[in-house]
């Protein structure tokens, strides 16, 4: 019980108060002005010699508290240039202020947690989205069942604010935040709730990403607690966790109750080979045991979203599949567990035995059809995968055209170098290479054959295929045999922090 008390006090101490005064700190908007905003946004319709002023922020906040803040006469803009109602300026400057203020305490908390765990030096590698694949290669070959889950979006912005309210105790700050969201919803009252959230995410990306990420973080914190204590919980006891305010007190009580009354069933609900992976709004659950426990976790998620977060989910979209028969999509790869069968001959005295050995290996495959669809959308090929010229780039110089294609090819090759089968990757390189040649031929108003014969660009365009070998030769300069082995194997680059647009198929 002392351990839970320490955790409770630690979480309480991390609750940040008095965020409201930070709204009026000029350095907060200086950060927004320097990093995220186009400078013209802050000076539009203002006329302060192209300098933003804290007085603007104070006046905007005052207007939000007024009852008639939505009613602005046509003559107001003539009396004072500031009172000219500019929706983008009004929304963005306040939204950016909210985002920066609310990020400050949680960033400090995150930095301190990294220092406590002593993982500051390896943090850059942990940030890589490809750092999850070595984990999958190590764990998933021993698992049998997988479930692909899409985390549902909240239907209203107020839900996101309520989740944040449990961690930050500052009534004036949340009152102002609610006024801001209420003002936004009124200005877009003709939109459905789903479209309203989509519009808000585009017009206020930083604030929306923080609120959504915090919603996912809160959902995962409850899920991880349930995972750790799953040996003490049964499905009917799950409803006691829905009031977040008394969460930790109930946790202490439940551990005592279940340790006394359900000690005989502890081992039945324990699942040591159960793994969870998430990227953005998509999560993967995998387990070695029978689908019974996977079904229980499926119901846990549904009740958690609907009862605690007021988010409607579709149980029919959550399927439990066998890893050996089905693949799952994550981070631009189709992954599944492949069975490798080999026969070993063993001889003992006069007898000879043939032993069949079955080993499992995680296969990561490049999804060639979605990538061709993305390349067709970007006008590099048609829907069948036949390369076409990029006519929009025909006005650039030959060097710029080749450099653009090489950059795209380099990024895709860098990203998909972890594929088990390189054939699809070579096809993508071929499409980009031929599209580059057709673009150059279109620029010079010639056919592909005539252009190559006249300019002799074949050697230059070979960089599409030789660049990967050059990178490996820099990493392993004296090991030619190592290069030959690595050429057909998977290599995960831990400097990839995000995927490009051609990889985002969903």
Swiss-Prot record:
- What is the similarity comment for this entry? Belongs to the intron maturase 2 family. MatK subfamily.
Say which species the protein is native to: Oxytropis pilosa (Woolly milkvetch)
Annotated localization: Plastid, Chloroplast
InterPro entries on file? Domain_X, Maturase_MatK, Maturase_MatK_N
Q: Which GO terms describe its molecular function?
A: RNA binding
Is Plastid one of the keywords UniProt gives this record?
yes
- Indicate what this protein is called per its UniProt record: Maturase K
Q: Which UniProt keywords apply?
A: Chloroplast, mRNA processing, Plastid, RNA-binding, tRNA processing
Listed under GO cellular component are:
chloroplast
Task: List GO BP terms, alphabetically.
Answer: mRNA processing; RNA splicing; tRNA processing
Free-text function comment from the UniProt entry: Usually encoded in the trnK tRNA gene intron. Probably assists in splicing its own and other chloroplast group II introns.
């Amino acid at each position: 019980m002392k351990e839970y008390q320490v955790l409770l006090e630690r979480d309480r101490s991390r609750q940040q108060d008095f965020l409201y005064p930070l709204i009026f700190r000029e350095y907060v908007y200086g950060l927004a002005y320097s990093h995220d905003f186009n400078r013209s946004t802050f000076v539009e319709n203002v006329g302060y010699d192209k300098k933003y002023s804290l007085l603007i922020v104070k006046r905007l906040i005052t207007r939000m508290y007024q009852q008639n803040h939505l009613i602005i006469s046509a003559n107001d803009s003539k009396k004072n240039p500031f009172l000219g109602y500019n929706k983008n300026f009004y929304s963005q400057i306040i939204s950016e202020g909210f985002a920066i203020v609310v990020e400050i305490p949680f960033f400090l908390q995150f930095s301190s947690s990294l220092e406590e765990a002593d993982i500051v030096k390896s943090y850059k590698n942990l940030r890589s989205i490809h750092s999850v694949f070595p984990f999958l290669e190590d764990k998933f070959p021993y698992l049998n069942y997988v479930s692909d889950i899409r985390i549902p979006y909240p239907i209203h912005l107020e839900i996101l604010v309520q989740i944040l309210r449990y961690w930050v105790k500052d009534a004036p700050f949340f009152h102002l935040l609610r006024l801001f969201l209420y003002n936004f919803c009124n200005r877009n009252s003709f939109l459905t709730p789903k479209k309203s959230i989509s519009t808000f995410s585009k017009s206020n990306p930083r604030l929306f990403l923080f609120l959504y990420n915090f919603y996912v973080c809160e959902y995962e914190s409850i899920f991880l607690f349930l995972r750790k204590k799953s040996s003490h919980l049964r499905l009917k006891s799950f409803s006691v966790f829905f009031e977040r305010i008394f969460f930790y007190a109930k946790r202490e009580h439940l551990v005592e109750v279940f340790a006394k009354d359900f000690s005989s069933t502890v081992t039945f609900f324990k699942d040591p080979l159960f793994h969870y992976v998430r990227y953005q709004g998509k999560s993967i659950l995998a387990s070695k045991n029978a689908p019974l426990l996977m079904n229980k976790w499926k119901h846990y998620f549904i009740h958690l979203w609907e009862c605690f977060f007021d988010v409607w989910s579709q149980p029919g979209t959550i399927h439990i599949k066998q890893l050996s028969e089905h693949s799952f999509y994550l981070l631009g790869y189709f992954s599944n567990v492949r069975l490798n069968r080999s026969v070993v001959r063993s001889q003992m005295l006069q007898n000879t035995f043939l032993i069949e050995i079955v080993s499992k290996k995680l296969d990561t495959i490049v999804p060639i059809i979605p990538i061709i669809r993305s390349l067709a959308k970007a006008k590099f090929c048609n829907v069948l995968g036949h390369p076409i010229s990029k006519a929009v780039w025909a006005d650039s110089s030959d060097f710029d055209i080749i450099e653009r294609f090489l950059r795209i090819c380099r990024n895709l090759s860098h990203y998909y170098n972890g594929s088990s089968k390189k054939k699809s990757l070579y096809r993508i390189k071929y499409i980009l290479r031929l599209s580059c040649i057709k673009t150059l031929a279109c620029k010079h108003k010639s056919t592909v054959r005539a252009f190559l014969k006249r300019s002799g660009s074949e050697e230059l365009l070979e960089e599409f295929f030789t660049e990967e070998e050059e990178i490996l030769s820099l990493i392993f300069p004296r090991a030619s045999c190592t290069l030959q082995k690595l050429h057909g194997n998977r290599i995960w680059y831990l400097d990839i922090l995000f995927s490009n647009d051609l990889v985002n198929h969903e």
